[in-house]
Amino acid sequence: RKDLDLWQAFLKFEEKLLLLAEDAGLKVRIVLEPSTPVEQLDFPAGAEYVVMCYNLYGNGTMPGPKADFAFLQQVYEKFRVLPNISYALANGGYIWENDGTTATQCRAAEAKALAEKAGVTPERDESSGALYFSYTEGRKNDTVWYADEQTLAQWTRCLGELTGEKVFISLWRL
């Protein structure tokens, strides 16, 4: 991620790819992680750049949402220098086990069904729009955070307000 020589090689590859794609009448879409050092690189015009706006929390972290409004603002500020940008959002979430850092991915429907089975009502987090709840099953106490349709709509609205224009969204789902 931080190997700038490797990034420079990638950008040379991308320039060649864009020329070949143009000759063939094809579009190019490049997916970038939030950790991409865009401030140190000069990405060429011609591709659609899709920025991953998720996995703020996940396996190996404490429980939390896939994204929150502050994270979305950071991603926007960092990547707005790119031409032709769109944003990737992810539904679903994670179930964190007892220790708080081991997490398993889950779909939004699975999380909702788990809450119903456990007899708990998920709460909506104000800083992210995501839903969360904890439950006990036997001797284990798990915590679930997930994004539903309302969460995705809030994240899309947040990005639209930041850009001041219509944003293009790619939806990642399990």
Write out the residue ranges for each language-model feature:
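Substrate-binding surface in catalytic domains of secreted glycosidases
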Residues: 3-117
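Generic serine detector
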Residues: 35, 86, 127-128, 134, ...
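Short, acidic/polar
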Residues: 33-40, 147-161
